[in-house]
Amino acid sequence: MVFDRTISVREKKAAKTLGIVGIVFFILFGIVISGVAFQKEWVQQLDLFFIDLIRNPAPIQGSAWLSFVFFSTWFAQSKLTTPIALLIGLWFGFQKRIALGVWFFFSILLGEFTLKSLKLLVARPRPVTNGELVFAHGFSFPSGHALASALFYGSLALLLCYSNASNRIKTIIAVILLFWIFLMSYDRVYLGVHYPSDVLGGFLLGIAWSCCSLALYLGFLKRPYKAA
């Protein structure tokens, strides 16, 4: 079996940092999911504030911005991110970095399974709007689009940070990916298919998952090349 190269001191430190950041985000997610599950007033106030901020004035049917939002939200669907994650994982495998490829694909896949389980557990109905802008089915919390974008694009951004690319390239691509994550989260509230707390929960869980899974890879899965 082929493993990845030896972990460096820098990567050991990165694994610890990512693990700590991931745990913090998991704790924040725990606060949000408990607030949603027990219908806390602060969650309702948060939802009302951001719904008014994002959807006032209301979306205009046929507008260029609404068309762009419809288009962009497609890039956070699991039916797109999961197959691409598989292709990326296979590409890493062809590069003799099997552990990295397996980690990337199963990190995304397990995140999707966790999402579906949490939706059934919380069973939060979707918001009722005055007009359906896009069809959405299933329960509302957490937002699948927010989680998928934070997990998939967040994992790509983290991998980029620890690559050999120049700092300028890293910064440009990382900023683009982070902007894309926030845009995907904004879209779901703008279209009226999620509460802001759904999006916040999906974002926090996606970032927590990507940080902790990369920490696991850097800390335990990377090994010197050897054959078995």
Predicted regions and their residues:
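Membrane-interface loops
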Residues: L48-I51, I84-A85, G89-N167
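Membrane-helix interfacial "entry" motifs
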Residues: V9-K12, G62-F70, F92, K96, ...
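Short hydrophobic alpha-helical membrane-embedded segments
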Residues: Q77-P83, L177
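Short hydrophobic alpha-helical membrane-anchoring segments
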Residues: G30-V36, F113-K116, L120, L158, ...
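N-terminal transmembrane-helix/juxtamembrane module of multi-pass inner/ER membrane proteins
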Residues: M1-K79, L120-V122, R126-V128, E132-L133
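Alpha-helical transmembrane spans of integral membrane proteins, capturing the lipid-embedded, hydrophobic core
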Residues: I27, F104, I108-E112, F203, ...
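Membrane-embedded catalytic cores of phosphoryl/pyrophosphoryl-handling enzymes
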Residues: F3-V9, V128-A228
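Alpha-helical transmembrane segments of integral membrane proteins
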Residues: L18-G22, A99-S107, I169-I176, G201
